[in-house]
Structure formats: structure tokens, C-alpha cells
């Protein structure tokens, strides 16, 4: 074999090794684990979840919401979120919140990219919008860019004191709701003895359900999708 042929052979071997390594990296998703990923079946763009995906003009999402807190709480509330076309890059979004003692609503412009407010919130609704932001809309904090809905996929890291806690996809589950059954993925993280869980599905632009605990292991808030029009 001539020196020139030897060089081509070595280059070909390294190319094959490089491709194999790339496939392995994709398959484990930079840290993915679990039965749903493999070298022959790596995650693709179809596995990505984007906040606000599938929102259309007149999309409506209805939730039951309860928040437990020493400073602010909300018991047995229903939250209705209605989207309509605003400008090219935002949604004109109506929020309606009601329970036994509250009946409030307001309209806010939310960015289509990340559902971030683009105008000021009316003063009388600020405290209620803060509760919605800290619960139903808090998925924005860990889905700042598209993330994989694949078991083991890392989503974020949260810090409690000196400890760093991974947030990742921990489970796949068929969840039954009043608007139908969904094949969902559970985003989870564990603080102390309690695991906080957020259920996501490709069919719904925001979480379907959540049960989130504080650092003392006490239930902080829970919500569930109870109505939907896409």
C-alpha cells in the first residue's frame, strides 16, 4: 500500500469513528438516559417542546389552581387564559380568575416567543397575575429555549442553598383529564423527600398538570387543565 493510500485509509477510519461518536452523543442527548433513547433512535426535532407551541388565534386554556403560602395563597380557583392575535410578534391574552371570593380579569400582551408580558399589568390585577406567573406560567423559567421531551433529558438546574438540583424528564405517563387523555412526559426535580412534577405533552402549549413542593417539603401549588380549545 502506498503512503498516499495509507493516508486516505487512516482519514476514512477517523471519519467513521467521528460519525459513530456523534451518533452516540446525539443518542444520549448530552446526558440523556432511559429506554426511550438509543444509538439507533436518537431524539429529533419532533421530540422538542417549545413553550406556546400550538397556540392559535382564539386558543383557550382553563385550569383549576390552588396555591398554598404564608404570604399569598389561592384556594379552589379557576383560571381562564384566552389568546387572540395582537401584533405580529405577540398575543393579546385575556386572563380571567375566579373562586369563591375573587372575580378578576385583565388583558395583557404576551410575546409569542416566550409568553413574556410586553406591557404593564393593571395595578388591581398585579397580585393575581404574579400568582399565575409563579405557577402555570413558571414553565417559562426552565423552558427558555426548546427542550427535548425524552426520558432523562436535562432541562435545567435549580439551586437550594449550596446544593444544585437537576431538573429533567423523569417519566412518561398517560394522563387522564376532563378534556381527554394525553401521552405526557413528567419534568421532575427532588428537594428533600418530595419530588416536584410538571406534566407536559406535545398537544398542549402549556403544562397539563403540576404538583410543586417548597424547600420544606410542603405542597406549594398544584394545577390541572380542565378545559381547552386550540
Model-predicted segments: where are they?
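N-terminal Sec-pathway targeting helices
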Residues: 1-19, 25
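Acidic/proline-rich low-complexity IDRs
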Residues: 8, 108-109, 114, 130, ...
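Acidic, serine/threonine-rich low-complexity disordered tracts
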Residues: 20-114, 153-230
